[in-house]
Amino acid sequence: MNPLLILTFVAAALAAPFDDDDKIVGGYNCEENSVPYQVSLNSGYHFCGGSLINEQWVVSAGHCYKSRIQVRLGEHNIEVLEGNEQFINAAKIIRHPQYDRKTLNNDIMLIKLSSRAVINARVSTISLPTAPPATGTKCLISGWGNTASSGADYPDELQCLDAPVLSQAKCEASYPGKITSNMFCVGFLEGGKDSCQGDSGGPVVCNGQLQGVVSWGDGCAQKNKPGVYTKVYNYVKWIKNTIAANS
């Protein structure tokens, strides 16, 4: 089980057999400024995604932890200075105390910004969930990630994918013995579209609420192997308590 260190969104060509030479592409270029809560975590290079939940706090994945992180907000094309980005260093990086790097249970992390983000057309917050994600709900997954099944082909512009929440039973059947109550699956059991090696820590937003954090998966766009995400609803109390204790 490998964490998705660079999330992308993939769709295998259904009319052709899958092989390592196929370039799996999927999703679409997000409309600029349409995902204003999406952030890029940078340590000299983009390595993970995250979500702005208030002016000074970001949610990401526990396995994205680094001792020094610069949070980049208002990004669309990460290779171009577009003029409205905000680059803010992390003041505190707090991984969940029960994070398990082997099972990726409790794969969630909070980042406190050293200064408050300026909310504008390019940068805004996303709400925490008020209920767990319902089966069948369509969600938006976003990030900058590898669009090649073999080798590396990283998009400069933010990518988006629309995908449904799968039932917990189907999720557990896809990964026997590996799915905890803190995880859920989003995607397509028939394969063809998936998150794949890229932008862990990035958002899964359903009905305007941050329901998931990109966590892990087995391969890309494989049949019966959907993407696995941290269930943010289970951590709302921890998030609120941690923010209050570190204000």
From Swiss-Prot:
Keywords: Calcium, Digestion, Disease variant, Disulfide bond, Hydrolase, Metal-binding, Protease, Secreted, Serine protease, Signal, Sulfation, Zymogen
SMART domains linked to this entry: Tryp_SPc
Cofactor(s) listed: Ca(2+)
InterPro entries reported for this sequence: Peptidase_S1_PA, Peptidase_S1_PA_chymotrypsin, Peptidase_S1A, Serine_Proteases_S1, Trypsin_dom, TRYPSIN_HIS, TRYPSIN_SER
Record annotation: effect of changing K23R: In PCTT; increased rate of activation
Signal peptide: 1-15
EC number(s) stated in the UniProt entry for this protein: 3.4.21.4
Co-factor note (free text): Binds 1 Ca(2+) ion per subunit.
GO cellular component terms attached to this protein's record: blood microparticle; collagen-containing extracellular matrix; extracellular region; extracellular space
Single Gene Ontology MF annotation: metal ion binding
SUPFAM superfamilies found in the cross-reference section: Trypsin-like serine proteases (SSF50494)
Family: Belongs to the peptidase S1 family.
Protein name: Serine protease 1
Gene (UniProt): PRSS1
